[in-house]
């Protein structure tokens, strides 16, 4: 036995020398017992309630539907007037999920966990009819240990049940219903890093060096003590080891120990907005010299600080936080967002110059934080809204921070939003305790709140690190004077003006939703001019105040819910609508924060019946000046408005505020309407550098299809659709006239078809008063546009999306899907116990993607190695073969009685895997 053990130790030593210590060789993490598998597919769902124990024939015969996660049943409707307006008049009910899980025999001596990234809300989980746990919050992730409740065997089902009660809402917004984020199955050795158990901080950072501290919580769930060795390797983006730490400690049975390790990185590559560089840390656990766990943590190195007079600094550079609020939903899908939607949302905002995302009003989705890390978007991570109680607040603080504290994008933990306890003794008590806990869990980040009431009472403003206000810039000015030591971070919300894409308040017809707007605004229809004016006035004040770190637009993107009055199913206060179509106000930010020459004019130029009447034409630009022309006749040149003068404490007595603060930030012409072409020419140094034209269009004639994100980024920046059954593509349909101009008032019904097995999982048009079904294959255009969301299958290749409409020329677009990238090998053994010398075990190595799904097209060369009392079928301890349909297979046979056999599978560029076989 000692011979086999020594050989395996030598193999691991050579593996690490070859992969870690060569300056020219990428490091690949060594094989371990940890396996993480996504379990999103093939759940059964029903929207009704019954006891879990009622697993009768009657219950099984109910109309359960097959669903895949993420899943939001509320968005399926129907819209009913008697339902809650904050939830978009959509149902909030009780639902049940069930799923059979199969665990191979080789997991029998491991730990088995289930992880839910988010379930809305008040969920209960059963495994094989045993109640595992209850989780109240709809926004924090949670983990359950299933080990004592599951059975093992490829043909033995384990019955998983989840009851979700979404009747009571947490926030005053649309929150959806169901398991709306990913779910995972995690298998580990009994000696393992706890889930979310590694915390990496950078206490001292300069361009020359960075000091890294890694805290790693290791659990020993064996019934005997274990001598644990933890080796932590820091890997740069090229895969090279840049630092390494090692420490050993004896951990008693059924207990845990937190390792604290420190190392120095020379010439660290700092994470920044324009260069979001990421490192990886691998925590490698050895038990008696055998590697049993490898845990990956992604992090970035950067510094930041808030200054009471000068605002925010990132890596020593002063930066204005150009922020936006956003919920977590989308047209047609509700809250059940595929990962690509998070990328679409954050990238669309970043392309306008936004650099700061506030996850109002809940902890951000893990995948959205990953995107922010990757593209360089700072984050305000909101933990709680109400300050419900000490118990609830502190639990949410712990759950959120432990999960999210390694994301370099996160800079602030927000402890409440517009709580009625602001400025009270009880509120100060809760928020002080929350700040203390936040600092204990994460000493590197700061706490804040989003206040709507005075916070200069009862020590409330002193209870957090950064003071932030919703809308009250005058209150912020006074508090800055009265409390000069306060770090007044942001207007955490500003504007809140509503505006519908393509609606200007001068239309000669009425829409169904106009009556609702009249009710809301005392007879005044909110329109795009008013929305833009309000946004301009707020941002102009923010940038005039040096002490302000920045501000967060309310909101960046339209969200379901909070319409306030029937039939509105959304507030409509975003710079993007529910489909991510830009409204005119979006281009205000483009003009403020981007360098490439641009000019944007509005409104559209279809005003039949208003000939000769003056139309207000507004223009946003980052050029020196703009010339406007109507049918090639110049209407004059206007210079870009000047920047505001900086605010000083003396300005506070100016009522109304100084003129420089309230000056508009757009150019404006009154143009007597005549059909034709209106053109804006952006000038720099007197030369035209950009042009936008708007034409009076003809009648709808044809449909044009394209990928939605081409409105924001070049096609080359958009990742191909992945054929994994999870990825999606959003197809935009535009209604064009004969000259191929978008008809800005078109509302034609568009029918979508997919000419393969891909599925249409939702449709939308951005109309906040539409009650059309979200789960459909057709949708009316709203002001010329609509979308369909297409989900991939697990078959790579090309598929065609086609769109038709009565009386219009149809269009089609070809979309290519590619096979998922192979990431890792997972190894199985059947049987995993050998009791006879002539018995064999089949070892199967699966080539898997990042979700833990087998890649059926994979043909990678796989090398098997073993140590222990066994040989491969070729009578050696090494066997190489090619995978077929994603699997490489080999048999082993015992060489002698007694002992453990460890089989490792390796393939170039992939994370290797291992499995144990017991020879009796």
Where do the protein language model's features map onto the residues?
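Beta-strand-rich structural segments
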Residues: 214-218, 603, 617-621, 681-682, ...
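Extended substrate-binding grooves/exosites of carbohydrate-active enzymes
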Residues: 31, 35, 66-81, 130, ...
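Extended acidic/polar, glycine-enriched regions
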Residues: 153, 217-307, 668-675, 684-685, ...
């Amino acid at each position: 036995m000692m011979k086999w053990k020594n050989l395996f130790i030598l193999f691991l030593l050579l593996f690490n020398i070859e992969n870690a210590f060569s300056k020219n060789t990428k490091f690949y993490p060594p094989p371990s017992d940890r396996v993480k598998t996504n379990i999103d597919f093939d759940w059964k769902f029903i929207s009704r309630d019954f006891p879990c124990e009622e697993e009768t024939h009657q219950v099984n015969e109910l109309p359960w539907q097959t669903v895949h996660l993420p899943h939001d049943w509320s968005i399926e409707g129907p819209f009913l007037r008697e339902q809650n307006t904050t939830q978009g008049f959509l149902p909030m009910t009780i639902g049940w999920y069930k799923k059979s899980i199969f665990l191979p025999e080789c997991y029998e001596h491991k730990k088995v966990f289930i992880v839910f990234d988010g379930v809305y809300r008040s969920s209960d989980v059963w495994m094989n009819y045993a109640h595992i746990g209850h989780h109240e919050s709809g926004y924090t992730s949670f983990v359950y240990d299933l080990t004592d409740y599951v059975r093992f065997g490829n043909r033995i089902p384990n019955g998983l049940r989840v009851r979700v009660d979404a009747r009571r809402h947490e926030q005053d917004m649309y929150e959806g219903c169901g398991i709306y984020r990913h779910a995972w199955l995690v298998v580990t050795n009994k000696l393992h890093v706890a889930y979310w158990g590694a915390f990496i901080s950078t206490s001292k950072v300069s361009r020359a060096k960075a000091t890294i501290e890694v805290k790693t919580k290791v659990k020993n769930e064996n019934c005997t003590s274990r001598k644990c060795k933890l080796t932590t390797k820091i890997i740069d983006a090229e895969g090279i080891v840049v630092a390494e730490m090692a420490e050993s400690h004896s951990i008693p049975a059924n207990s845990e120990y937190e390792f604290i390790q420190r190392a120095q990185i020379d010439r660290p590559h700092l994470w920044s907005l324009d260069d979001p560089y990421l490192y990886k840390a691998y925590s490698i656990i050895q038990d008696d010299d055998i590697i049993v766990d490898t845990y990956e943590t992604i992090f970035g190195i950067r510094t930041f600080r808030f200054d009471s007079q000068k605002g925010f600094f990132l890596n020593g550079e002063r930066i204005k936080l150009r922020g936006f609020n956003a919920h977590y939903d989308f047209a047609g899908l509700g809250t059940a967002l595929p990962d690509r939607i998070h990328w679409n949302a954050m990238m669309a905002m970043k392309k306008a110059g936004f650099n700061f995302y506030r996850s109002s009003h809940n902890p951000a989705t893990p995948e959205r934080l990953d995107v922010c890390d990757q593209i360089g978007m700072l984050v305000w991570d909101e933990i709680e809204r109400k300050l419900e109680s000490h118990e609830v607040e502190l639990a949410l603080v712990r759950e959120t921070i432990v999960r999210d504290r390694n994301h370099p994008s996160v800079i602030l933990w927000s402890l409440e939003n517009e709580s009625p306890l602001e400025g009270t003794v009880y509120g100060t008590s809760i928020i002080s305790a929350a700040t203390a806990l936040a600092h204990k869990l994460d000493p590197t980040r700061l706490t804040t709140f989003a206040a709507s009431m005075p916070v200069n009472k009862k020590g409330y403003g002193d209870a957090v690190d950064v003071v932030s206000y919703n809308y009250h810039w005058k209150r912020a000015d006074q508090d800055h004077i009265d409390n000069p030591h306060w770090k007044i971070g942001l207007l955490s919300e500003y504007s809140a003006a509503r505006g519908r894409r393509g609606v200007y308040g001068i239309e000669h017809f009425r829409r169904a939703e106009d009556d609702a707007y009249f009710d809301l605004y005392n007879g005044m229809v909110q329109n795009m001019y008013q929305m833009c004016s309000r946004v301009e006035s707020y941002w102009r004040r923010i940038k005039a105040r040096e002490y302000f770190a920045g501000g967060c637009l309310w909101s960046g993107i339209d969200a379901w819910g909070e319409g306030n009055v029937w039939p509105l199913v959304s507030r409509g206060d975003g710079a993007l609508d529910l489909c991510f179509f830009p409204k005119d106000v979006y281009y205000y930010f483009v003009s403020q924060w981007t360098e490439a020459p641009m000019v944007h004019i509005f409104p559209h130029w279809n005003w039949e019946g208003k000939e000769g009447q003056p139309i207000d034409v507004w223009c946003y630009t980052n050029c020196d000046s703009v010339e406007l022309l109507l049918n090639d006749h110049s209407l004059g040149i206007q210079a870009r408005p000047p920047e505001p003068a900086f605010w000083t404490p003396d300005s506070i007595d100016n009522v109304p505020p100084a003129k420089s603060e309230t000056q508009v930030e757009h150019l404006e012409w009154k143009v007597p309407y005549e059909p034709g072409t209106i053109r804006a020419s952006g000038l720099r140094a007197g030369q035209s550098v950009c042009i936008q034209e708007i034409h009076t269009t003809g009648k709808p004639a044809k449909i044009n299809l394209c990928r939605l994100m081409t409105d924001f980024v070049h096609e080359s920046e958009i990742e191909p659709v992945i054929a994994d059954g999870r990825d999606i593509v959003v197809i935009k349909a535009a209604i064009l006239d004969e000259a191929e101009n978008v008809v800005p008032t078109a509302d034609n019904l568009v029918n979508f078809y997919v000419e393969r097995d891909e599925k249409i999982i939702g449709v939308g048009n951005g109309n906040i008063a539409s009650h059309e079904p979200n789960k459909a294959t057709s949708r009316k255009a709203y002001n010329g546009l609509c979308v369909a969301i297409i989900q991939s299958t697990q078959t790579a290749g090309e598929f065609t999306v086609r769109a038709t409409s009565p009386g219009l020329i149809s269009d089609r677009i070809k979309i290519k899907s590619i096979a998922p990238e192979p990431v890792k090998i997972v190894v199985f053994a059947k049987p995993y116990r050998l009791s006879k010398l002539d018995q064999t075990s089949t070892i199967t190595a699966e080539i898997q993607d990042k979700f833990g799904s087998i890649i059926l097209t994979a043909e990678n060369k796989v090398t098997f190695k073993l140590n222990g009392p066994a040989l491969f079928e070729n009578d050696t301890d090494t066997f190489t073969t090619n995978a077929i349909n994603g699997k490489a297979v080999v048999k082993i046979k015992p060489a002698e009685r007694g002992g453990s056999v460890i089989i490792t599978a390796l393939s170039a560029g992939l994370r290797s895997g291992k499995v144990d076989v017991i020879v009796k």
